[in-house]
UniProtKB/Swiss-Prot annotation:
Alphabetized InterPro entries for the sequence: Nucleotide-bd_a/b_plait_sf, RBD_domain_sf, RRM_dom
Residue span, RRM domain: 15-90
Signal peptide: none
Keywords: RNA-binding
Gene source species: Mus musculus
Gene Ontology MF terms: RNA binding
Protein name per Swiss-Prot or TrEMBL: RNA-binding protein 43
SUPFAM superfamilies referenced in this protein's UniProt entry, alphabetically: RNA-binding domain, RBD
Superkingdom assignment: Eukaryota
Amino acid sequence: MASAWKVKDPTVAERTVVVSGLPVGLLKDQLVKCYFQDEGGHVEEVIYPSKSKGVAYIIFKEKKVAQDFIRQKKHPPGSEPRLTVSHFSEKVFNYVMAILDLSVFRTQIELESLVVDLKKKIPTLNFSPLGPSGKISVQGSFLAIMKLKQALISKAISPLENNRKDAGERRNWNGENPRRILQKRENSASILGTFVAEPAGSPETLVLDTDIFLYLKHKCEFYHLTLSKYHVLCQERVDGDVTTICLQDAQDGSCSGSVRHVKEFIEECAQEFHLELRKELLVLEGMGDREKRNIRQALEELGGRYPRVLTNVHSTHIDLIGPPSDTYLFKTQLMKSAGQKVT
């Protein structure tokens, strides 16, 4: 996987193009790789297959050729025009690896059958062989891991709730703007006159990618307005890349259903942000004091110019999180401020 880490080099990243939606299969993998390597001698390396299914990383010898390739949006012969061609940019959350202990399900179902069922429900996940103790490692996107979590929770509680017809109620995600989602929920609530009755004071817990949660908290005013409007208290626990949120009714159950209402709203916003946001990384290591001072000054000046970009300053690097175009331009301006060449 040495070539995969090569993309992390800033000088390589700017010459790298990401092509997603490619066909998966041994013969198809070979055809795709041969096709992209035959780009008039301009390709330095093709990383395919990669950790992400159907995603290829094309490293060109020159940045300009990579930019031209993106503009032309070339596709392999015979493929459907559903491929996504974009400049390499580290996603807010690329992939997650989790170790599961499925032994608790032995009394309900054969564990091998459970794994087969999970693979069918969430095909984007990669599963390791099932261990004799019932443990298995799983790797995939953050959203896929969260779907897996919900599937396992439903499997665990289903024997206790067979008589509850609404236990498995699902939400329809349609990619609406968060403010429109909230307005839609408010309209539904006003028509019904009240929320569906729930046990008073029942807290709700959800898990979010830390970068997405910080963006929601610091860049989205409606997040705080929603908590206040529905009288919901929020307790946060940040643990590296994952943040756990506990929501609880601040009025001791006087507004039944408000906690779940807020939880579903936050989950839908987080899903939208996961698809829309990108993270750019500016490495500070190796910079002199003058360069770092210029970076800090530029951060203050550019903050007002790019209000949709969240900046997290660390001792070794700066995270820029926001819409792809804004984060890229923000990073470009910071590099210029540090005296680094931007081509």
